[in-house]
Amino acid sequence: MEKLLSLLNASDDIVFNVNIFLEDDTVMLTNAKFTVYDYYDEDDHICLVQDNGASLVLPKDGCVYFEDEEGDNWRFKQGDLEVYIYEE
C-alpha cells in the first residue's frame, strides 16, 4: 500500500488499468482506464477519484502487492469482489 501511495503522491493524473472480478470469475470490468485525479487515504481504505467524479474504494486490509512482467500490480479483495490495478 505504501508503494501505491508514493506513486499517487509522485505524479498528477496517473493512469491505471483496472480489472474487477467476482470470486466465481465473473468479469465485472476489464482493462478499464482509470485516471486518478485525486485520492483519499483513510484508516481502512483508499478512495481513488477520477476527474468525472467516479470513485473506486479499495480496502487496505485486502491489499496484496506483487510484480510480474507487466510491472507493478495490486490486488484488493473484499468479500467476493476482487479488484486488480496496474500502472499503465
PLM regions with names:
Residues 26-50:
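Amphipathic, interaction-prone secondary-structure segments
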Residues 14, 76, 84-85:
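Generic preference for hydrophobic/aromatic residues in regular secondary structure cores
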Residues 1-12:
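N-terminal helix-cap/turn-to-beta initiation motif at the start of protein domains
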